Design a protein with these regions (language model features):
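N-terminal leader segment of winged-helix/HTH proteins
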Residues: 1-30, 77, 93, 134
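Alpha-helical linker/hinge and terminal dimerization helices associated
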Residues: 15, 19-22, 58, 100, ...
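N-terminal helix-turn-helix DNA-binding core of bacterial DNA-binding proteins
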Residues: 17, 21-64
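Residues in the recognition helix of alpha-helical DNA-binding motifs
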Residues: 68
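Charged, amphipathic alpha-helical coiled-coil/dimerization segments
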Residues: 71-129
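Exposed, interaction-prone assembly regions rather than primary DNA-binding/catalytic cores
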Residues: 125-139
Length: 139
């Protein structure tokens, strides 16, 4: 095996998985995963939204978003109902969801601060810039 071989895709996935574990471990205190937190935060950002707009904002395929929101509906954190006089379904936070999100934001901010401190602000900013660039590569 070539010991000099270093697939950046796999290395980025490993780093992403590690970071996901860090945030999931912190958010377990409020019975959420980072993906659920992100979905709730984006629903909060949009206010009342629809499935198409939420999928676009999250940059996820519709199947993944549907699977994620079904879990959040079962947890009574969001509602997904037909808009009056329309076939369009509206997604919004429930009262329970708003409360859970307030708790989760505090934990997320603490975790984010620890992550930045461990990495160093210069590295954090560089990684943020690189993530943006990597996300836009189209070859």
């Amino acid at each position: 095996m070539d010991h000099n071989f270093s697939c950046k895709c796999i290395r980025l996935r490993k780093a992403s998985n590690n970071l996901t574990k860090i945030y999931d471990s912190a958010l377990i205190k409020v019975d959420l995963k980072i993906t659920q937190f992100s979905t709730l935060k984006n629903i909060q950002k949009l206010g009342k939204t629809n499935f198409k707009d939420l999928s676009y904002l999250l940059e996820l395929d519709r199947t993944t978003v549907l699977r994620n929101i079904e879990k959040l509906i079962k947890m009574n954190l969001i509602s997904y109902k037909n808009e009056q006089n329309s076939k369009n379904k509206i997604i919004q936070l429930t009262t329970v969801g708003k409360s859970k999100l307030r708790e989760a934001i505090i934990i997320w901010e603490e975790t984010q601060h620890k992550y930045i401190k461990a990495l160093g602000i210069k590295n954090y900013k560089e990684i943020d810039t690189l993530i943006t660039k990597i996300s836009k590569i189209n070859i």
